[in-house]
Amino acid sequence: MTKIFKLISLLYLIINSMSIAIADENFFNKGLKLFKDKKYEDARFMFERGIVFNPKDSNSYLYLAKIYNIQEDQDKEEKNLEATLLIEPSNEEAILMSMKIALERSNYSKVKDLSNTFSKVCKKLCDENKEILDTLSNIEPQKNDS
């Protein structure tokens, strides 16, 4: 009798964990579709629900950062980018977005540090780094002149 109970319990746990994994992926996919349809509040809700099921989903944090970027909430954008980079330190988009925030805030040393990291991990967006460094080189001499 106890063997049957253990078997049923094990089967229940396996099925339950599979449904949680599927639900997490489903929330992200729904959120991504809503994001592409420019329904940002609904997408934000889906990404947040996905994070509840899987707090280590770096893509959900990244898309939350993109939503907050669109909504011009830089503090929340930065927090979500930090979470993304904490989970996935080599995420190109998150590093690039963080560089742009640091550039806006005139935090040139952070831009340079992020640029060094970006240079090591970039695969798709390498040209963006060059543009930011060009912008940085145009700004820094002006800072020294004044």
PLM features per residue range, with description:
Residues 49-50, 83-84, 117-118:
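Canonical positions in the second alpha-helix
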